[in-house]
């Protein structure tokens, strides 16, 4: 009860608006999360960014964003937004929409296989991962994708996958992406917005200037061609400080009106191309949701 009272007191004193970030979450949990934040008002991402740009108040306003374009997540939660008249932004990584699984999905597949089949990690000829615990292995793989380039990431992950499971057989159970026809149909509604999450979902800090430009420009063009609407926001893959560098922020400023991270915080005196978001997950109770928002 005391924590609840403190949370409510802090929430009432907060001045800046905020951007929520979701990944894979059930529609029931998503709806409960948003309703727990009312009467604060969900508004379009573009609008909250514009208010922030002009120095206008964003108090008691927030924007809803979903990363990665997982089909079930997008379709089911879009229905929730439609029912409640909530504006929502979906960040799409283009290669995933075109059929290529995301690196973190491969790691989760490795983790699942390890937990189901092995008491310890099976023998590997990779000297970097000999005599390593399963927990440590998964932590190291996640650490790697936050800072490494696409070729290294895929090389390592495919190496492990081939050793411990039949990838061609099991990948059918991996999360499917939304398809372009579905993107086009949803985009017809004014409540929806599809924005860029790059091409390959690779940390931009691991890329050359040419690669960063390609990720940003090509993804922007692909979505605009599909929806016929302007793509004005970029979401940095992984979103952590170590996954973003000064060069990527500078390049984003040339092609977009804003760019978002997964660094927790509210919209205060933030760089428009390094905007914080508040991440919410399936396991978060509504009390924790309000606490996260209160302390951000």
PLM regions and their residue ranges:
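C-terminal active-site subregion of NodB/CE4 polysaccharide deacetylases
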Residues: 1-65, 71-72, 188-189, 199-202, ...
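Metal-dependent polysaccharide deacetylase catalytic core of the NodB/CE4 family, i.e.
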Residues: 20-23, 59-62, 82-242, 269-275
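Aromatic-lined substrate-binding rim segments of carbohydrate-active enzymes
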Residues: 72, 80-82
């Amino acid at each position: 009860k005391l924590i609840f009272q403190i949370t409510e007191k802090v929430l009432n004193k907060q001045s800046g608006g905020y951007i929520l970030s979701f990944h894979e979450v059930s529609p029931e949990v998503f709806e409960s999360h948003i309703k727990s934040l009312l009467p604060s008002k969900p508004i379009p991402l573009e609008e909250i960014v514009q208010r922030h740009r002009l120095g206008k108040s964003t108090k008691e306003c927030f924007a809803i964003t979903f990363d990665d374009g997982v089909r079930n997540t997008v379709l089911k939660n879009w229905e929730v937004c439609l029912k409640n008249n909530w504006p929502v932004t979906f960040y799409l990584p283009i290669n995933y929409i075109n059929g290529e699984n995301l690196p973190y999905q491969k790691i989760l597949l490795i983790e699942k296989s390890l937990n189901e089949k092995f008491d310890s990690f099976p023998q590997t000829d990779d000297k970097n991962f000999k005599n390593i615990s399963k927990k440590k292995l998964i932590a190291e793989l996640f650490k790697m994708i936050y800072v490494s380039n696409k070729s290294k990431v895929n090389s390592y992950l495919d190496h492990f996958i081939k050793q411990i499971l039949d990838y061609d057989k099991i990948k059918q159970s991996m999360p499917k992406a939304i398809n372009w026809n579905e993107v086009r149909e949803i985009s017809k509604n004014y409540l929806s917005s599809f924005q860029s999450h790059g091409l390959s979902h690779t940390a931009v800090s691991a890329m050359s200037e040419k690669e960063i430009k390609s990720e940003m420009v090509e993804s922007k063009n692909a979505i605009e061609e599909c929806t016929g609407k302007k793509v004005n926001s970029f979401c940095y893959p992984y979103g952590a400080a170590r996954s973003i560098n000064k060069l990527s922020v500078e390049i984003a400023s040339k092609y977009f009106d804003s760019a978002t991270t997964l660094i927790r915080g509210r919209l205060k005196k933030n760089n428009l191309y390094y905007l914080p978001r508040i991440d919410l997950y399936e396991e978060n109770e509504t009390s924790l949701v309000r606490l996260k928002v209160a302390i951000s």
